[in-house]
């Protein structure tokens, strides 16, 4: 009665579940790598921005001190 074709439903479902699990894990790995790359880029940019603001503040302070001493009455 059987023509020799035997369908392994449990095996097919198991393989499908395993494949979906691997795909999901790969998506998590890609998202993880992307977040790590963003963090690696943001860290030096943040430090550079902080250094730039500090330099600008120092320069502005020196300019204000020079202007103040130029305006101040001489004794």
From Swiss-Prot:
It is found in: Chlorosome, Chlorosome envelope. One of its GO terms (cellular component) is chlorosome envelope. Residues 8-61 are annotated as: 4 X approximate repeats. One of its GO terms (molecular function) is bacteriochlorophyll binding. This is Chlorosome envelope protein B. One of its GO terms (biological process) is photosynthesis. The keyword Lipid biosynthesis does not apply. Component of the photosynthetic apparatus which may bind the chlorosome to the bacteriochlorophyll a protein monolayer. Keywords: Bacteriochlorophyll, Chlorophyll, Chlorosome, Chromophore, Photosynthesis, Repeat. Belongs to the CsmB/CsmF family. Sequence repeats lie at residues 8-17, 29-39, 40-50, 51-61.
């Amino acid at each position: 009665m059987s023509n020799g074709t035997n369908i392994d439903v449990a095996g097919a479902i198991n393989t499908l579940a395993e494949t979906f699990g691997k795909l999901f894990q790969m998506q998590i790995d890609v998202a993880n790598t992307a977040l790590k790359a963003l963090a690696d880029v943001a860290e030096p940019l943040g430090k550079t921005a902080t250094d730039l603001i500090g330099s600008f503040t120092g320069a502005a302070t020196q300019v204000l001190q020079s202007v103040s001493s130029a305006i101040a009455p001489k004794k």
